[in-house]
């Protein structure tokens, strides 16, 4: 049996690790990349997701270059952007920012873009951007105050995590659910398979 080449995940997101585990994929190394995620002037949310995922992948590649232990490895990076129209809703740092985001999302449709970037063993970059449309119910004051108190908004693009309490806010979703969680699993697995990564290697171990 051919040896499966190592996969580096250029992220520290527990959600992305969990999603990969669902597909039987276990990264050999996690490499969170601390980059400036500020959008450029007039940058479209889709373009931002694409750019940041590529920058994370390139930063991880630069960090391992020259280390023979990681020769021929794959590097996977992702970045998720939530927006209402072209207004980008970043990860809130303060309760007030999360509150503003929830008020904006209330009763409206928004889009979630996730850019995924794969560095192949021959150091070629392969990219995709996945788009999901989500509509929230009209949130009551109690909904918002209770959600803020739960703390589940922390570290989440757009100030919410669909896999938690906020899943009950969703009236309609068109597209990939896992994209909203943080990594479009179907598209990610297809990208890996298309570039020769053996995703089936650990299925029998379960």
From Swiss-Prot:
Its cofactor is a divalent metal cation. It is an enzyme of class 3 (hydrolase). One of its GO terms (biological process) is nucleotide metabolic process. The keyword Cytoplasm applies. The active site is at residue 79. InterPro entries: ITPase-like_fam, Maf-like. It comes from the Bacteria. Keywords: Cytoplasm, Hydrolase, Nucleotide metabolism. GO terms for cellular component: cytoplasm. It catalyses: dTTP + H2O = dTMP + diphosphate + H(+); UTP + H2O = UMP + diphosphate + H(+). Belongs to the Maf family. YhdE subfamily. This is dTTP/UTP pyrophosphatase. It comes from Rhizobium meliloti (strain 1021).
């Amino acid at each position: 049996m051919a040896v499966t080449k190592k996969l580096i995940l250029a992220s520290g997101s527990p959600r992305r690790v969990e999603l990969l585990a669902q597909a039987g994929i276990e990264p050999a190394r996690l490499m969170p990349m601390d980059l400036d995620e500020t959008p450029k002037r007039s940058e479209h949310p889709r373009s931002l997701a694409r750019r940041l995922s590529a920058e994370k992948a390139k930063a991880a590649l630069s960090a391992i270059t020259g280390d023979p232990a990681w020769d021929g490895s794959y590097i996977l990076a992702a970045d998720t952007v939530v927006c209402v129209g072209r207004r980008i809703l970043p990860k809130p740092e303060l309760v007030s920012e999360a509150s503003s985001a929830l008020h904006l999302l209330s009763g409206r449709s928004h889009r979630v873009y996730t850019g995924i970037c794969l560095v192949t063993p021959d150091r070629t970059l392969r990219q995709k951007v996945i788009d999901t449309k989500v509509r929230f119910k009209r949130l009551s004051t109690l909904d918002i105050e209770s959600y803020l108190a739960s703390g589940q908004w922390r570290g989440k693009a757009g100030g919410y995590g669909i896999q938690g309490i906020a899943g009950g806010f969703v009236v309609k979703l068109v597209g990939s659910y896992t994209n909203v969680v943080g990594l479009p699993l179907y598209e990610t697995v297809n990208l890996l398979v298309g570039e020769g990564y053996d995703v089936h290697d650990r299925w029998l171990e379960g």
